[in-house]
Every structure is written in structure tokens, then in C-alpha cells.
């Protein structure tokens, strides 16, 4: 199979966890409150991924995003967590990337109407995002080697 896996360089990664009572207020400041929304920057990189109810993953946040997070915390909407080291960022590409992932879940169906999702791929907790002809994945770091081994096995 033609599938390439590349572990991306470590970068700053934050999560924002909204207090249940504050989710409605986030809508007023233009945060998507529907899980599955993926905000992408002009260069195509992920900016804010709403991967589960009340939870957002923010890979390598720029100054503007950091300011938005600080404002959310200051307004009492939730907490910002530095989760550097929690996730291993992986890029899965090639004509058979979807087929490899389909051996664990129907990734096309999961991401059909959403920009991102919290899923379990090969029993590894993952935040998945479709990116044109490839997948950007944030695999729980303690599972990354197991994930890479599963992809390697299926890519042969």
C-alpha cells in the first residue's frame, strides 16, 4: 500500500476546556460550539479544533489565538491547558491513507460532515482531521509507537 506516515516536529499545543455553564457565552464571541468544527488558518494549518463537547485542541497557537484563549479564561468561560507532550502530531498521506485508517474505523464517514473528531484508531486515542488528500492526526503520545507500528504493518 502507498501510505506515508510522518511524525511532525513537536510544537506548542494547548487545549481549552469550557465550563458547561459558559458554552453558550462562547457562541457570542464567535467560537464554534458544535463539536466537529475545525478552524483553519490562511496557510491551511489547523488553528482551533473543536474535537469534543466543550473541548478544543489548539496546535501551535499564534499570538492572536493566545489572546483569544486568555480572553476566554479572563471571562470565566473555561481553562487553558498547556498539553505539550500529550499529543504526537502525525501526518498520514498517500493514496492508501484512507484505506489504512478504514481498517480500524470508517474515517471517511466519521469526517464526512465535520472538520475533526475524537476517535480511537487502532485502540489509540486520536484527534483526526482531514486535510485535502491527507490526514492530520494527534495521537495520544503514549500510544504513538503502537499507532505507527499498526500503520507500518498495514502499509506493506
List PLM regions with ranges:
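Basic, glycine/lysine-rich polyanion-binding surfaces/domains
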Residues: 1-156
